[in-house]
């Protein structure tokens, strides 16, 4: 036994000499001895604690592990075994897999325990071998461990070249697990956050389930701020999702906080984590896509509802019964009814200060809707006022008298734009470009310059009366679906325009006008008509680039935001369309038309449904009004 111990000790000294020679010959190259983990260094030991008794009664050699030591000189452990000094713990002397700072970190404890268990299994298997084979294995491992990178690669090449398929398969199964690197945890935080910012929402949520370190990084506010910036009020080009602004809900929360909470509560409401903001909007968008909503009805008008608009707390409706209803969206109750028009209220517009209504009685009224007082009345149209729009001190109106009027409130002047040959059903201002759009029963759409009161373009393509138009500025034009063959035509000259009789009448210039590129005109125009279609137009060229079919009867009204189009039809249905693709996402059927008899019983008129006369859209809701006087709210924010 003494002879055996001396032989082993001389063998260990020889390994140390080989290591010293290797270090001196490769001083410019970092040795892999320093790359070995202190806890996984394979040592040859002969102590009673590390040697096991075999069935033959002889001592067996084992692979032992030891704890880190900070002593710079050769030391002796409790069993008398000589050990080598350990390098400092840093990334310049350790690779990722053998770095103690990583091994002992909380996020890698489980991985370290698995490796330690694996080492113990190897020790146990070696201990079962004869003493000579144990010595040979330890010599091979020691030689490999003390070699530099170049020698290690040569040894591996030789081993792999002499290995058969069973051994190669075994190596492959081990390496697949061992080469995995948790780069997120070891990189600087800024780089880790940058990498995570490229993930989509689903992948980012999955990342929080990996470990605590990943959860902390994936939940960082900076990552979710980037997600919100990519998706809110725009469509992400990578995943195709866009999230609503929910500005009306935010205004509603601030309004409630101002009335019932302290400044600290308001501050709490306005400083929510970006992940919470994203989650809230993601749920709303998901409900829009799946068609999940809660329906609420507003009943109070005695006749059909012709127009409606809303803000974060109030709903305004105009009806054939010549009244304007103001509803509380929280309670669903009618809080005020404005009377003054002598005929049906066909159109309305409101802002924070005033309410403007147009009626079949040929007048336009301006109201203080808070007090219910009529501030002023505008008379000038010779037939029913069908549409009004306003911006600051300018009001535009369209009428059944075939004209568009521009009212300048401050200068108290009115200009009449002539060109349509039938009723003007809708007018829309675009303040940034000082332009106005109008559509008519003559199947045309006209674009006007309200500074010069001249007609810039005429859009032709509908084969039925055009009922509604919406100017749009679409940024993501590349992903906008268009028809390969458009039946629309370029703007054409119209010889039917005549001068007005009064001095303020302004004849339109029908000569085709090239739009000034320096003026921010809307990029597209959306329209609907009684030809059962919805059309999308390119404002610059004046051509129809897409036609959407789906309704079986005329489309009376449309509304749109950055993601969706809502349409209401005479067939009694409300359809939700994707703005970019033009595909119909959902169809909501209107209520069946019923009338009460004198005995308070309801009599159904067969399968007939109430035609939808008007619609409007918000971030998390849309509204419809039908010809039986019922208003419906489709609420997609189910948490409210």
Curated annotation (Swiss-Prot):
tRNA-binding found in the keyword field? no
| F-box domain boundaries | 181-227
Q: Which UniProt keywords apply?
A: Amino-acid biosynthesis, Cell cycle, Cysteine biosynthesis, Cytoplasm, Methionine biosynthesis, Nucleus, Phosphoprotein, Repeat, Transcription, Transcription regulation, Ubl conjugation pathway, WD repeat
One CC-aspect GO term:
cytoplasm
Ranges for the WD repeats? 300-328, 340-368, 380-408, 419-449, 461-499, 509-538, 550-578, 607-635
Q: Which family does it belong to?
A: Belongs to the WD repeat MET30/SCONB/SCON-2 family.
This chain's protein is named F-box protein MET30
The organism of origin for this protein? Saccharomyces cerevisiae (strain ATCC 204508 / S288c)
């Amino acid at each position: 036994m003494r002879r055996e111990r001396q032989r082993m000790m001389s063998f260990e000294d020889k390994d140390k000499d080989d290591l010293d020679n290797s270090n001196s010959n490769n001083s410019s190259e970092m040795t892999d001895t320093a790359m070995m983990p202190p806890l996984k260094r394979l040592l040859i030991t002969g102590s009673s604690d590390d040697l096991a008794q075999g069935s033959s009664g002889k001592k067996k050699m084992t692979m032992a592990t030891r704890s880190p030591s900070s002593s710079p000189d050769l030391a002796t452990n409790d069993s008398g075994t000589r050990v080598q000094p350990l390098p400092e713990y840093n990334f310049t002397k350790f690779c990722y897999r053998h770095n103690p700072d990583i091994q002992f970190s909380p996020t890698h404890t489980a991985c370290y325990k698995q490796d330690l268990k694996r080492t113990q299994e190897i020790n146990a298997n070696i201990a079962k071998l004869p003493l000579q084979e144990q010595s040979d294995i330890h010599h091979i491992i020691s030689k490999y461990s003390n070699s530099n990178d170049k020698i290690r690669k040569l040894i591996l090449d030789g081993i792999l070249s002499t290995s058969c398929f069973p051994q190669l398969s075994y190596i492959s199964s081990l390496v697949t697990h061992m080469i995995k690197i948790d780069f997120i945890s070891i990189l600087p935080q800024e780089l880790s956050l940058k990498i995570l910012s490229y993930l989509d929402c689903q992948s980012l949520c999955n990342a929080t389930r990996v470990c605590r370190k990943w959860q902390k990084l994936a939940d960082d506010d900076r990552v979710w701020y980037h997600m919100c910036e990519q998706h809110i009020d725009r469509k992400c080009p990578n995943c195709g999702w866009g999230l609503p602004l929910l500005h009306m809900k935010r205004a509603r929360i601030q309004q409630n906080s101002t009335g019932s909470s302290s400044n600290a509560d308001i501050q709490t409401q306005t400083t929510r984590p970006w992940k919470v903001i994203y989650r809230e909007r993601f749920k709303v968008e998901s409900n829009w896509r799946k068609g999940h909503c809660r329906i609420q009805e507003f009943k109070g008008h005695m006749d059909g509802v012709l127009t409606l608009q809303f803000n974060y707390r109030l709903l305004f409706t105009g009806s054939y019964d010549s009244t304007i209803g103001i509803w509380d969206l929280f309670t669903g109750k009618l809080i005020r009814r404005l009377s003054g028009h002598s005929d049906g209220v066909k159109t309305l517009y409101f802002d924070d200060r005033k309410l403007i209504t147009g009626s079949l009685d040929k007048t336009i009224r301006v109201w203080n809707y808070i007090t219910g007082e009529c501030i002023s009345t505008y008379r000038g149209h010779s037939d029913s006022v069908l549409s009004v729009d306003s911006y600051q001190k300018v009001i535009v109106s369209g009428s059944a008298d075939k004209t568009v009027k521009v009212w300048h409130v401050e200068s108290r002047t009115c200009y009449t734009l002539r060109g349509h040959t039938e009723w003007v059903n809708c007018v829309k201002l675009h303040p940034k470009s000082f332009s106005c759009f109008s559509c008519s029963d003559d199947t045309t759409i006209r674009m006007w310059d309200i500074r010069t009161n001249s007609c810039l373009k005429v859009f032709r393509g509908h084969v039925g009366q055009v009922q509604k138009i919406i100017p749009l500025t679409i940024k993501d034009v590349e992903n906008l679906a268009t028809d390969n063959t458009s039946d629309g035509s370029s703007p054409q000259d119209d010889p039917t325009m005549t001068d007005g009789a009064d001095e303020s009448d302004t004849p339109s210039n029908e000569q085709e006008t090239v739009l000034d590129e320096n003026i921010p005109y809307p990029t597209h125009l959306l329209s609907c008509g009684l030809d059962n279609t919805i059309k999308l137009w390119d404002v610059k060229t004046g051509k129809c680039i897409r036609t959407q079919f789906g309704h079986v009867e005329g489309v009376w009204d449309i509304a749109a935001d950055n993601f969706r189009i809502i349409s209401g039809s005479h067939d009694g249905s409300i359809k939700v369309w994707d703005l970019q693709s033009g595909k119909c996402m959902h169809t909501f059927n209107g209520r069946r038309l019923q009338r009460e008899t004198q005995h308070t019983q309801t009599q159904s008129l067969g399968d007939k449904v109430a035609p939808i006369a008007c619609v409007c859209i918000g971030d998390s809701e849309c509204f419809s009004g039908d010809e039986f006087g019922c208003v419906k709210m489709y609420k997609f924010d189910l948490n409210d």
